[in-house]
């Protein structure tokens, strides 16, 4: 059984017991989080597709950890002009473990 949920403006395919990284959620470590924006639920041959969301669909997850991703380096450079700008960015994420899929 798996579901497709919408979180942080992105779609994620999730299954029970799966651990995945999402955009930062405002929830404490160990807290339960519910995702009610379920786009699709599949259980074998039984497929439910929402328009846009599955009615009564809910995915429950537990927050495992918060952290920051790898650094992305940004460089702006203009040739022959002695002009160079450097910046870096580390995106915050929340790691969750899917505990239940209800549809």
Curated annotation (Swiss-Prot):
Pfam families: Ribosomal_L21p
Molecular function in Gene Ontology: rRNA binding; structural constituent of ribosome
GO cellular component labels: cytoplasm; ribonucleoprotein complex; ribosome
A biological process term (GO) from this entry: translation
Endpoints of the signal sequence: none
UniProt keyword annotation of Nucleotidyltransferase present: no
Protein keywords: Ribonucleoprotein, Ribosomal protein, RNA-binding, rRNA-binding
The protein's assembly and partners: Part of the 50S ribosomal subunit. Contacts protein L20.
Similarity comment: Belongs to the bacterial ribosomal protein bL21 family.
PANTHER family: 50S RIBOSOMAL PROTEIN L21, LARGE RIBOSOMAL SUBUNIT PROTEIN BL21M
Functional description taken from the UniProt entry: This protein binds to 23S rRNA in the presence of protein L20.
The protein, known as: Large ribosomal subunit protein bL21
Gene: rplU
């Amino acid at each position: 059984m798996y579901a497709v949920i919408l979180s942080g403006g992105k779609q994620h395919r999730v299954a029970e017991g799966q651990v995945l990284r999402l955009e930062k959620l405002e929830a404490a470590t160990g807290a339960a989080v519910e995702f009610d924006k379920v786009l699709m639920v599949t259980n074998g041959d039984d497929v439910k597709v929402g328009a846009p969301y599955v009615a009564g669909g809910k995915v429950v997850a537990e927050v495992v950890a918060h952290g920051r991703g790898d650094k992305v380096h940004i460089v702006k450079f203009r040739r022959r002009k002695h002009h160079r700008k450097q910046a870096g960015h580390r995106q915050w994420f929340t790691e969750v473990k899917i505990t239940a899929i209800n549809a």
